[in-house]
Amino acid sequence: VDVVGYQAEDANQVLAALEQKKLVVVLMWPGHFTASGHFIILRGLDEDGKVVVADPSSRERSEVSWDFHLIVDEAAKKAGANGPFWVIG
């Protein structure tokens, strides 16, 4: 499986990957998804262009579509392996 890391300034590459139906792992900082640090999966885009997530600690957050820019804003600013976004496939 190919995995490519992207930083927040490469958000357009991440959005393009979602448009290609690729999964994206994201390390989040405190905000809507976590109080400390937390991984979520971006599963794709809904019909309105919002992001559908898989949040292992919240079924409720997994059933809501999210604004892509909110996710980018709350993603970790410092992450190893070229993160905080990792595109799978």
Question: Predicted segment positions?
Answer:
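Active-site-adjacent substructure of cysteine-protease-like catalytic cores
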Residues: 2-58
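Noncatalytic regulatory segments and standalone regulatory/sensor domains
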Residues: 19, 23, 45-89
